[in-house]
A protein has these predicted regions:
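N-terminal export signals
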Residues: 1-2, 89
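Immediate post-signal-peptide N-terminus of mature secreted/exported proteins
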Residues: 2-46
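Mature-region segments of soluble proteins
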Residues: 9-11, 23-28, 47-168
Length: 168
C-alpha cells in the first residue's frame, strides 16, 4: 500500500527518539532479557534497540512510559548504588530487575518499575522474535507447501479406485 510505504519512509526519516544514555540502557536491559546463548545471539545482536526506537516513533503512546521507566530505573540505581543503571555492577542491575520482573511478587513501591519492565520485556521479545536471529532461534521456516503423495490408499479403496492408473 502506498500509505504504508509513505508512513515507513516518514518514520525512518525521523531522528532517533532515545538519547545515547537511554539507548545504552535499553541495550543493556535487552541483553539481560534475552542474552546471547549457545543457540542464538542476544537482543543487541538482533538490533532490538532499532525496533524499539521505530515502535516508539510509530506508536507515540510508548514514549512517555518508556522514557519515564528508564528515568525511574536510573533513579532507583542512583538512590541505592550512587550510579546509573548502566554504571551499576551486574549483580546490582539484576537485583533491581528481580524486584520488578515478576508482577505477582512486586512490592507496591516497585509497581511503576514493574509496569515499565513488563512493557519493555514485551517489546524486546517482539523485536527479537521478529528479527532474523529470533526467527532462526525458534526454527520458524514460514509457510511451506505440503508434499503431494497422491490420493491415500485407504481413500482409493473406499471408492473402489485401486485399479485406476494415474499419470502417463
Amino acid at each position: 500500500q502506498d500509505f504504508e510505504k509513505e508512513r515507513l519512509k516518514e518514520l525512518n526519516n525521523k531522528p532517533a527518539f532515545f538519547n545515547d544514555h537511554e539507548r545504552l540502557t535499553l541495550i543493556a536491559l535487552g541483553d539481560l532479557i534475552i542474552p546471547k546463548d549457545e543457540v542464538s545471539g542476544s537482543a543487541s545482536d538482533a538490533k532490538v534497540i532499532d525496533f524499539i526506537d521505530f515502535i516508539v516513533k510509530d506508536i507515540p503512546e510508548h514514549q512517555v512510559p518508556l522514557r519515564g521507566g528508564l528515568k525511574w530505573l536510573d533513579l532507583q540505581c542512583l538512590n541505592r548504588y550512587g550510579k546509573s543503571f548502566t554504571a551499576s555492577a551486574a549483580n546490582q542491575q539484576l537485583e533491581i530487575l528481580e524486584e520488578i520482573a515478576y508482577p505477582t511478587k512486586v512490592k507496591p513501591e516497585m509497581h511503576q518499575g514493574a509496569v515499565f519492565f513488563s512493557r519493555l520485556r514485551n517489546l524486546v521479545a517482539t523485536g527479537f522474535y521478529t528479527s532474523q536471529i529470533g526467527i532462526k532461534d525458534i526454527g520458524y521456516v514460514g509457510n511451506v507447501p505440503g508434499r503431494w503423495e497422491g490420493v491415500p490408499a485407504d481413500v482409493l479403496k473406499q471408492y473402489n479406485l485401486t485399479q485406476v492408473k494415474y499419470g502417463v
